[in-house]
Every structure is written in C-alpha cells, then in structure tokens.
Design a protein with these regions (language model features):
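Conserved glycine-rich Rossmann-like NAD(P)H-binding loop of the short-chain dehydrogenase/reductase
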Residues: 53
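Asp-based, Mg2+/Mn2+-dependent phosphohydrolase catalytic module
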Residues: 1-23, 28-50, 59-80, 90-300
Length: 300
C-alpha cells in the first residue's frame, strides 16, 4: 500500500498525544538544523499540549551531551525527553538485572561509557582502546577479562582489530556473555555532507567472528518503545513516530503499533519510498517536519 502525502496536519496532530522524533535527518544534519522552521514546529506542538520525545540510534553521545547539542542549536529540550541508543544499552542491562559485579566491554564511543557508568555498571574498552594494536607474532596470546559479562557494540569512529578480537574473546570464552548492539544502522549522517558507514558495520564484524546474533536495543527493536510507553504511561496507538529512515524509524513505529510519518529531509528520497523494491510504507510522508506548521492556517 503506497504512503499518502501529508495534507491535513491538523488531523494528524489531533489524532495523537505524543510525537517521537528521530534526530539525524529530521531535526538536524551534522551540526545544523534541517530548516529554520524546526523550533517553531516544536513550539507549536508543545502549545497544543503534545508530549515530545527525541529518539536517536546514534550512541556516540549520552543524554546529557545530546541536551547540550539541542541547546547549542537553539532548541529547548529537557534531558528526560531524550532517548539515545547509548541510554538504551544501559536501560536494557538494568531491565535484565545485569549483575553489578560483572563488567561491560564497550566497542563504541564515550556516550555508551557515560550512560553505563551513570547506571552503575563497570566498563572497559571504548575510547581508551582507540589506539591499541595487536602484533600477530608467533605464539602471541591475547588476554581478556574473564569478568566481562556483556559486550556492547555501537558506532565507533576508532574501530580497530584489537577491539574486534577483545570483544570476540569475551563473547566466545566467557560463559553467558551477552552481545548487545545499540543499532544495526547501515548508514550514519556524521557531518551532513555525505552518508557514512553506520554502526551496523561494527556490529557485523563481531557477528561475523562470533556467529552470534546480538540483542538490538535501538530502532527498529521495540525495546525503547516499550520503555518510553511505560515511563510516560502512553498507549502506543496515541504515538506518532517521525523519522527519515524506513528500515529503522518507520519499522520501529510499525513494530510498536504507532502512527508513522516519514520525512524526506534525511536518508530516504521520494524515489526510494515509491520504489517497487521498498516493502516498508509509512502512514504518511512529507518533506520536513516544519510542514506540520500548516496547521497554523487552520487555527488563525
């Protein structure tokens, strides 16, 4: 079924109580807002009593760091409204009562380390392993910490062979060691200029060496949808998921039973949406989130 173009913003806004926004490609690209209408759009939705939630698969920052980015871009967003996949990793470990005497090896950046430590977990790896190398000399044996009970893999600009081997050893040799992925995104809009290989490439390397499927805590897994719905006491049918990626954002909304709105300001083009190869169809699509401002004309 082909997606319908957003024509009646008023009807959409009135039909839900919560909007969940993806960030990269929806709110911003790199370090710039998608368009000048973003702040006005968010203000309008708040003025109509809508709850706003911001959900990103980008694990490089913590919620606190994302709060700072929103402020830098001139947006007033409370830290409690922000949910990153780095936070999701920590929330997942809390939800399964991960033992506090066990450690977490991180293949990723400081956002994951910050959120895990904030939740009280012992971490190793992450940025501190960025420059480590392995010399494959005859007889070399690589040691690893036997107390690691989970390996968390996210987007990592400093990905290297040392991290692959260390994570692989933990998963293969530590009994019951978990393999957790913050996301399996194929692309990442790192600087707003071009698309870059996403966190899925790092996850794929560990999957390839361990032959173990990860537990995915970011979109399109419903873990964060369930978490957000429970935290705020929302029925998922009262949520509209707004995103720019079909296989993460829109699928996430569909998996969670939400309304879905695709914006064409990020990864997905109109041609990709309409392609016969595409099997994921949002309820509605539009060019950018400021198209929701069309509601103003009906309320004046």
């Amino acid at each position: 079924m082909a997606a319908a173009k957003l024509e009646d913003a008023d009807a959409l806004i009135d039909s839900v109580e919560t909007f969940i926004f993806d960030c990269d490609g929806v709110i911003w690209k790199g370090d710039k807002l998608i368009d000048d209408g973003v702040p006005e759009t968010l203000d309008l939705l708040r003025s109509k009593g809508k709850r706003l939630v911001f959900l990103t698969n980008n694990s490089t920052r913590s919620r606190k760091q994302y709060g700072s980015k929103f402020r830098t871009l001139g947006l007033t967003v409370d830290e409690e409204e922000i949910f990153s996949s780095s936070f999701a990793a920590a929330a997942y470990l809390q939800s399964i009562h991960f033992p506090k005497d066990k450690k977490v090896y991180v293949i990723g950046e400081e956002g994951i380390i910050n959120e895990l430590e904030l939740a009280g977990f012992q971490c190793l790896g992450g940025p501190s392993d960025a420059d480590k190398k392995i010399e494959l000399t005859p007889g070399f044996y690589m040691e690893h910490d036997k107390d690691v009970g989970a390996v968390v893999v996210g987007f990592d600009r400093y990905f290297n062979y040392y991290k692959v081997q260390y994570g692989t050893l933990c998963i293969r040799e530590n009994p019951g060691c978990l393999f957790i992925a913050t996301s399996r995104d194929t692309v990442f809009q790192l600087n707003g200029v071009q698309e870059w290989a996403g966190g899925g490439s790092m996850v794929g390397a560990i999957l390839g060496s361990t032959k173990q499927e990860p537990v995915v805590v970011g979109k399109p897994s419903t873990f964060m949808m369930d978490y957000i719905a429970k935290k705020f006491g929302i029925t998922t049918s009262q949520i509209c998921m707004v995103g720019d990626m079909l296989d993460t954002d829109i699928l996430f909304g569909q998996n969670g039973g939400c309304k879905t709105l695709l914006v064409l300001s990020g990864v997905t083009s109109h041609e990709m949406l309409q392609s016969h190869n595409n099997s994921i169809h949002p309820d509605l699509y539009t060019n950018q989130i400021s198209d929701l401002l069309a509601v103003k004309a009906a309320t004046v």
